[in-house]
Amino acid sequence: MSALPGPLAKSFENRAMATNFHGFAWALLRRYWRSLSLSVNVDELSMVDDNGAVNELISRGGRLIWDEKKVVDNFLRSMRNGQDDDLRRGVRSFNRIIKDRFVPNGLLPYSGMISLAIELLADFSKLRSYLSTAFPVVLVDEAQDTNALCYIFLKGLLSDESGICMFGDPIQRVYGFIGAMEGLKTKATTDLCLSPMELEHNHRFSGGSIVGELGAAIRSNMKGAIANGMPRLPIYVGAAQQDEATAIVSKVAALIQVGVGRIAILVRKRGALADLIMEELTKEGISYFNGLFSDTSQEFIEFNAFALSKVTDAASGEKGVSRSAADKIIDSISDELLTGSRRFEYGRSYAMLLGALRKHLKNDCVAMSPSERFDYIVSIFSEGSLRRFSDYLDADISMMTIHSAKGLEWDTVFIPGVTRFDWPGGICSRCERAGICSRSAHECRIVDAKKMPDGLIEEMGLLYVGVTRARKAVYVSASMQRRTNYGNYQVACPSCLTFLPGIEPVSWSVMDGEG
């Protein structure tokens, strides 16, 4: 809403709710938990990552019998595999275990938030009718990343009179590994009676933008075609990962000197190369935001639960929070992270995001009443959506994974580690055996784009997301040696993603000289 002109934003304040699936489910459970026969309000429960839920339950003295463990495993597997029919059949059994085993031990698995909300909507038609009246139109952004469980929840929110629009880009579907549904566009078109529409132009990149041309070329490759033109991809190739890290930080320092604006270093995943880059940044005295934490990690979930308890405790007995009270609450949480007894690995990063939230509240939420401000802050920590305020960070340099950078933008983006076996990863061996690619000592190229496996196409989509996070310039890098998961070193080369048909790789210096 902050992007809208003042009067227009004000007119929407009481007519629109911006949240995510988990945030909306949490809001329902906070109000209607008794209807589900829960023994306590969900505010009193600790969120726990699905993967660690059973172990956390056992550590608290809880237990699951074999059949219950099997139900939980099968349900989560169906969610990851996008099997919505299996989820519908299993949701009641899964929820029974949530209520009988997890909730009495103070726990709520992350997916349990959605599954309980599904049951709530299914059992209480009046609530469903009320919601469809209160929210007659539902807009879903980044729809391509919707998983099967959230899709069932979405359908439960809708009535025959509901309006729904889903916005997304199948090419940017990068969460398949945790359940983002394949073929969602086709399925939603049938299930929800939607009319598919496709935009022909990306208006973010107009007037011959280098970044826009690169993005278009990557998209064409994902569709098995070659775009017109030959956009250039700036790439640095180091002898080893240490050389790559040193070159990136040296380039970042040079760009800071000339004032290029905000910069991001976006890695495929945290690992040896990311650690080397951060060590170099620290050595050079360059301040940066470390955003390499996962929004679904147990630590981040625990941080949000901790912050939420601080907010609710501070506002206990009050009708809301004033602007000054909100500042004090945020400051107290930050102080606890940095100097108190509650320590997190990414505590400094969370504190920086709290500062960004404070700035957002000051700049964009002046017109909120105390009760609206309280509900808004509660929703942020309930959803775990603090990262979306990254634009308000005081740090000009950010380090994140590409997955967590979706929806964000920077002036300049670095994409390290586009090295064979690191990116696209283990699929490299399969591609070579199938004759899809051709490898030499210095490069790997795709020779038969029509046979590309889905896994390789998804890795291209991840590269596309990374490239299009840049407004002005993008720099890619690779190395001729990589560190394996076992700590050994292996001869490598730039991956096929740096030599896609229709894209010309050039050195950073050549690109800068022409710019």
Go through each PLM region and give its residues.
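Helicase P-loop NTPase motor core
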Residues: 193-194, 200-286
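Conserved two-lobed SF2 helicase motor
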Residues: 17-23, 109-112, 117, 395-402
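Helicase C-terminal subdomain and adjacent C-terminal extension
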Residues: 447, 454, 472, 478-515
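Accessory N-terminal region flanking or inserted into the helicase ATPase core
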Residues: 58-139, 148-150, 176
